[in-house]
Amino acid sequence: MLLNIVLISNLACLAFALPLKEGTRGSRCFLNGELVKTVNTSKVVSECCVKDDISIIKSNAEHYKSGDRLAAVIKYYRLYQVKDWHSCNPIYDDHGSFMILDIDNTGTLIPKMHTCRVECEIALNKDTGEVILNSYRINHYRISGTMHVSGWFKNKIEIPLENTCESIEVTCGLKTLNFHACFHTHKSCTRYFKGSILPELMIESFCTNLELILLVTFILVGSVMMMILTKTYIVYVFIPIFYPFVKLYAYMYNKYFKLCKNCLLAVHPFTNCPSTCICGMIYTTTESLKLHRMCNNCSGYKALPKTRKLCKSKISNIVLCVITSLIFFSFITPISSQCIDIEKLPDEYITCKRELANIKSLTIDDTYSFIYSCTCIIVLILLKKAAKYILYCNCSFCGMVHERRGLKIMDNFTNKCLSCVCAENKGLTIHRASEKCLFKFESSYNRTGLIIFMLLLVPTIVMTQETSINCKNIQSTQLTIEHLSKCMAFYQNKTSSPVVINEIISDASVDEQELIKSLNLNCNVIDRFISESSVIETQVYYEYIKSQLCPLQVHDIFTINSASNIQWKALARSFTLGVCNTNPHKHICRCLESMQMCTSTKTDHAREMSIYYDGHPDRFEHDMKIILNIMRYIVPGLGRVLLDQIKQTKDYQALRHIQGKLSPKSQSNLQLKGFLEFVDFILGANVTIEKTPQTLTTLSLIKGAHRNLDQKDPGPTPILVCKSPQKVVCYSPRGVTHPGDYISCKSKMYKWPSLGVYKHNRDQQQACSSDTHCLEMFEPAERTITTKICKVSDMTYSESPYSTGIPSCNVKRFGSCNVRGHQWQIAECSNGLFYYVSAKAHSKTNDITLYCLSANCLDLRYAFRSSSCSDIVWDTSYRNKLTPKSINHPDIENYIAALQSDIANDLTMHYFKPLKNLPAIIPQYKTMTLNGDKVSNGIRNSYIESHIPAINGLSAGINIAMPNGESLFSIIIYVRRVINKASYRFLYETGPTIGINAKHEEVCTGKCPSPIPHQDGWVTFSKERSSNWGCEEWGCLAINDGCLYGSCQDIIRPEYKIYKKSSIEQKDVEVCITMAHESFCSTVDVLQPLISDRIQLDIQTIQMDSMPNIIAVKNGKVYVGDINDLGSTAKKCGSVQLYSEGIIGSGTPKFDYVCHAFNRKDVILRRCFDNSYQSCLLLEQDNTLTIASTSHMEVHKKVSSVGTINYKIMLGDFDYNAYSTQATVTIDEIRCGGCYGCPEGMACALKLSTNTIGSCSIKSNCDTYIKIIAVDPMQSEYSIKLNCPLATETVSVSVCSASAYTKPSISKNQPKIVLNSLDETSYIEQHDKKCSTWLCRVYKEGISVIFQPLFGNLSFYWRLTIYIIISLIMLILFLYILIPLCKRLKGLLEYNERIYQMENKFK
């Protein structure tokens, strides 16, 4: 035993004597490496081994004793995998192309994106479809979008494009180029065979004829299968296919065929007469066959035996296979192979309540009005019938209508018979009573009834319901919470109508009245003004104004479910009291959570709440802070100031003065009453809290602290530099306005700048406004300062980054700007401040973004305000976004020169301007008649109008004709682009965890601290009883005691950028009109019609899906799905968020540690945040969303159609007499240029001369886009576009009777790829992406059209029920119909096989 103790003591001495050397621990990951940072810390940081895009980083920690605690020296090493990375001159960029881990002064690893600044050239080889990058030094590139590839290169690299259409962003150096390019044909087949042994030429030929190869293969395989089937009886299943054709042949044979003289069968010039008749009978001689035919014994052509023979024939089956394959491929081949701010809660609540009240009142009022109106109408009808019965009667003797007044019955008639109320005596004339007889009564009653009805509808209900401290001059002895609480607005019992501000401040001085009126006080801003005031007397005075100005708003808090209750209730639900965590059944918890048990919140069965608080000041303070935060929204204004004072001084018993005044007024608001009763209960808890003195700022403190200033004259004009500066505090005598700070410059008064006062960076005795450069003005004080009391205060200068000089900084960007007429070279540093720079030199340290602000970092530079800088121009060396250049050539010569240029790799799109707005496909033409005001010699203000679907890339050709049918000219209407776009703002980045930042501490004995200290955004971990024998700190001999605790944060690699929609969607349609002599385009908003002197456009829209609210972007692709908003850390994509302020995340860390005797433990963190990055990998890529190449984040949604465009094109006046349909034309000159069989086509410019106005048709050996042109002596230049699918030596063009030939100028290059803008239609060999087969179209556009109205609106469970019923019906049909039918079919096929064998004598 003694020997063991001696050995242990010796080991302990050796452990203390030998320092920990590098390599003893922490030498994992890699050996050697370059030391990049050393951090001294008392917080132990866990060792790391992580990788970024240029290196691997590891850390080694050496611990030592510092006083009574441990400290550590942490060394960070970097092993560069990209050796000469510094040659690319990197700079920090939020949207950079590669990630480097930065190490801050606490040892925390922070991922930062960077961009190289070496010049890089980006080009596109259109012949091969490759992106070409050139850089004279090492550089980093990234291609993202529909394809993704990235890496480092030097000198030159070629990256082939992979997809048929590419919308990509190429980043290389400081350039970022966005473009959209499409191959002429699909590349999926080529991409599949790429890398095989086949040469590229063979791959291209094979993929070009892929459909033909597949068709031939299918026919061959099908033919082999059919030959095999001929050996079985299954082949007779084709009888229904062959039989109709054989039957038709038999009918034609019997009726129309010419007969042979020898055998009486159909003539057979190349064969001998047969011995078998068409009815199947067999004879030995031709004469017997002829006799059989002559005697009419032949029953005719037998179709069924011939059909069975065809089923067994290999030739007929092969023909059937070919036909079936063609039909089958026409079916399956492609047709042509796309959180609310709590301050705003009351306003939101009031708005919702108002809208709901309007809806309710409208509904109730409409119902009451309807019932009331119906009642009035029914009453009037009943009154009318009663009056008619009382005043008149229908006589049964004579059939006429008599008045009841004076009517007498005598035997079989009355004294008024043969007379009717509608006229005089009828005598013996025939008259029968009808409704017309009472016309006078009806009209009279209708007028009277209408008047009565109007009177009944007049509303007659009129609802009217109107139902000691001097807070204006409070004394200095009353500035305690007890007295000040009596000045709270609700306690002043002002319940009458509001008082105007002029009456409230009538007793103030004129200057004070002007000042108060200038504040524009109202009920919405007065609470904020009270809270921002610095003197309690001013706050009390304005609380009094509030009580008079806003009595309804002040007492709204005591009305249950009012707008004023929303804020404190929301906070009460958000912050859980500590007592509710342990005793959730308590009435106060249920009251705050669900408004239950609010009448008994003080109930404390078994004294559980008392036991929880008594003797536990920490628990009491925790819940009191929550209560104070809630009450700040119950009594805003002065009450909020007093509650903050209570919280600061910890004089919680002073809360009774506020709670006691609120309780009597809250009897009608049960939830508020219950909450206040609980406040009274918790204040009775038996706890001892040490209070601090009151810290209210009062006028008496200001008055007694400084000496008076006699000279208070305001400065005459603004000044830049303040000499002999003094700080002055001025206030009104009664404290109506809060004290203001001023500065005295040579005894002249100026306003204290809101941005602070600084010492001049070249003369410390002078003062500057806002920064140390004296670039901002000191404004003179107001004239009313002479009426205030002013005190000289101690001169204080602002201490901020503007007052601290630095030799270097982490520069974000360089530039220049105008500062008071002088041009300054400036730098914006990572702290967001601007500095003057005299040299832009790198600091040559391991910090790659650290730059000197002067030569060799010798001089200190001070920041200045950005407001002093105007006309800022940032250097072009900073990141520059580029787009492909578009050149519109006005004449054919320049266009042909561009086509024949040898530059094949430039990202430039060349257009012949007159033909730019034509589609790539020749449109279908229709004829439209000219409309307008017809006059004797023509049409005035002529126009055409029609509609066209608003589909991107759709075009229509129109031949315009006169009313007599004669053609005038052709125009092409082209929907050039349909744009559905919205702006998005950046939220955060997310990605996989590549490492963990961690810090931990150990205590030898005792428990873990509560709460565990940690940085913002870090999560904590701990383990009790961590000290044991052989597992303890230096000098710690505890067993089963102590604590190991710490905090951690994930290091993530940013891969997904999360954006949120920040604007409403905008839908625009651009429509182009092209004629042979002119072309123009107009853009119309979906919501706003376009009316101009040339064209009128409006769009009838259809319902479309809206763009997603939150999207994720990775490598230029847009993903949608369940994504967290900023600040939300639910277990889905975006649970760990990297944004400008740091990293957001949550989780329960999983950790372990390795013990060392007499040494600090090695903490091993296996998990920190709950990173649900795998959920991001399950997001759905939305191919309809693309990122536009704009300066801000703009997303475009591909839409097939937005509706229908109604257009009206104004064409001016036409004179019939001056217009000729057969004009005499001479072609003076013609030039053509372009390419064969390409979307750009062949552009031709013609110079024509004519002496009349007329129209001419255009003919050519190529296909023409415009069919008819209008010629005019005043117009000589015309442009047409041709499509030449085959190469021709010459192009011929005929205009009217004139013809001309020209040799076209053909492009030297043979581009396989075409550049165009993001929203324009790309023309390739496949268009329909929604339905790629005819079967799909049958389902989507045929069957679904029938069943969609029936089942489309049913819920999931109803559809499931219908599917089950249909399945049961199908099962019954299968069991009782299909199976017996198949058995019957099998027997029928076997019977035909036996008959066939008998007919051919095989049995």
Curated annotation (Swiss-Prot):
Disulfide bonds join 471-487, 523-550, 580-589, 591-598. The keyword Mitochondrion does not apply. Residues 1-17 form the signal peptide. GO terms for biological process: fusion of virus membrane with host endosome membrane; symbiont entry into host cell; symbiont-mediated perturbation of host process; virion attachment to host cell. Glycans are attached at residues 40, 493, 686, 1353. InterPro entries: Bunya_G1, Bunya_G2, Bunya_nonstruc_pro_NSm. Residues 18-209, 336-361, 470-1361 are lumenal. Keywords: Disulfide bond, Fusion of virus membrane with host endosomal membrane, Fusion of virus membrane with host membrane, Glycoprotein, Host endoplasmic reticulum, Host Golgi apparatus, Host membrane, Host-virus interaction, Membrane, Signal, Transmembrane, Transmembrane helix, Viral attachment to host cell, Viral penetration into host cytoplasm, Virion, Virus entry into host cell. Residues 231-314, 383-448, 1383-1403 are cytoplasmic. Belongs to the nairovirus envelope glycoprotein family. This is Envelopment polyprotein.
